[in-house]
Curated annotation (Swiss-Prot):
GO cellular component, one term: cytosol
Residues annotated as binding Mg(2+): 487, 493
Tagged with keyword Cytoplasm: yes
Protein location: Cytoplasm
Name by which UniProt lists this protein: Polyribonucleotide nucleotidyltransferase
Superkingdom, natural source: Bacteria
Keyword Magnesium listed: yes
Family of this protein: Belongs to the polyribonucleotide nucleotidyltransferase family.
Amino acid sequence: MGQEKHVFTIDWAGRQLTVEAGQLAKQANGAVMVRYGDTAVLSTATASKEPKPLDFFPLTVNYEERLYAVGKIPGGFIKREGRPSEKAVLASRLIDRPIRPLFADGFRNEVQVISIVMSVDQDCSSEMAAMFGSSLALCVSDIPFEGPIAGVTVGRIDGKFVINPTVDQLEKSDINLIVAGTKDAINMVEAGADEVPEEIMLEAIMFGHEEIKRLIAFQEEIVAAVGKEKTEIELYEIDEELSEKVKSLAEPDLLSAIQVHEKHAREDAINEVKNAVVAKFEEEEHDEDTIKKVKQTLSKLVKNEVRRLITEEKVRPDGRGVDQIRPLSSEVGLLPRTHGSGLFTRGQTQALSVCTLGALGDVQILDGLGVEESKRFMHHYNFPQFSVGETGPMRGPGRREIGHGALGERALEPVIPNEKDFPYTVRLVSEVLESNGSTSQASICASTLAMMDAGVPIKAPVAGIAMGLVKSGEYYTVLTDIQGMEDALGDMDFKVAGTEKGVTALQMDIKIEGLSREILEEALQQAKKGRMEILNSMLSTLGESRKELSQYAPKILTMNINPDKIRDVIGPSGKQINKIIEDTGVKIDIEQDGTIFISSTDESSNQKAKKIIEDLVREVEVGQLYLGKVKRIEKFGAFVEIFSGKDGLVHISELALERVGKVEDVVKIGDEILVKVTEIDKQGRVNLSRKAVLREEKEKEQEQQQS
């Protein structure tokens, strides 16, 4: 079989984007190699030939990192890649979210989209290349897909927007926005920002969309040249006659059940109606397939009725107005031995966050494809089953937990004080205790309170809120503070976090093809109003960060030494620094510029370690007097330690004013004597004199007697 390779090229933000099709992974339904600068990503799309007997679309998106892409060999004994890194999980979610809405309702064939990162140029995003490649692999395949989509990164430097900023440019940018969409609309947003106003964030999104249109035109050109004909598939549909029968049996009672305000009572009421309808069909002895379709019809009926109530009557399941927030409450200082804790409750959503402060040596070490080697601020999110009143296995964090944790981290990072002002590692853990929607945003609010309780001098408090949307034709309703049912049955989950001044994080997922500028603008403004209300509630609990850290938090002492003296502090094979740590019980972190951070829960231990280090790096000055201790005696003189780690020789002729026959006649080991530095020779050896000190003292006495 021949290997006909088709190559397509375009300029993308000043760097070359090349697509190769037809040579690699030809047994997949669709495959492309995307080269962006020196970044290379192989993206493939594969689908099962038959639909799966499921009531959801089985799509899997994987972004696979290979350390060979940056010339690294994995650490550990196994020497191969293990479980995906946090960055890989987030990238998989990033690609999944814009492509998922573009498969037809009722499509049940299993689809797997895999992107393998094979080479990384740090200034050419492998995530953006993988998103482009994933869309294109689906488009050139025979898998039914209503794309293409594309995504870009948008930065803002000195007030000007930049597409796909380099690593250096991102350092100067106050926005790090990833936006994806079709040629007609936006369908995914992920952003971090330094308290940027909503209006500017909206302009950044629309700026990114213009570049997306160009990338989609490029994909359409490639599809026209090498794309396969799409497979005809049979979509899963429910018989209309059955639907009408189910509707007639359920509708009267379902409407009132949907409008029960309390979550569990509402679920019970809806289930009661569903069970009654299913029971009637079971009495008529219908087969299992029909019963399954009845249950699916009932679920669809609930969805349609909730959406109708919201769009036509502006009525929400719990009775709130469209822009009304659920009851708010918060509390701090719940856990006495932790460094800081905050509890935030919004309706039936509740999060408890705990702040832990550590030394700079406690940073998280990153071993991935990026340039970042460590991070000193972390936010971890846990979602136990009891938060929704269910049982289930206790597993490690999944994609959702990692994604929500990262969103909170992004929202809070802009307000974390820098290392110079606050030399601590900060770890936040958010425990979701109750869930009825917007738990990620509740964790942001609780984390802000926990840091303030811990005494972290944050630049400003941060609050988060989740906005929803129900769209029917040209009509739509934007919802403030969506609960679980509105999230599940609505068209959008738009999370906005920020301070009083502006936005620090955005995340938008939708289930429809895209959103217009008008809807985005309305959602952002409505979110701002809600965020201010939440911030006011939080600040009524704790108005500002505590002035003092917890007594259980480590105390950190900072000192600076000459960088050339770092080796003296560390010692051969770390012997010296390990001895200091062992003797004082502190942690010591040394920067290359000579900054030293000493930490422990005991301030006196810090001071003790500081004194030892000061003595180690102290420079001996000729002519200076020192009170030293005799450490060793030889025939020719006495060795005196003038400060920790520094000895000098007092020759026998320099011990006294008169002639000395034997060193032991004047000093013994352990004696403290005042000596003067007379010389430091070329080999760094220090010569001391007691005679010089005695002579000076005698001369002073004579002067005083004469006067």
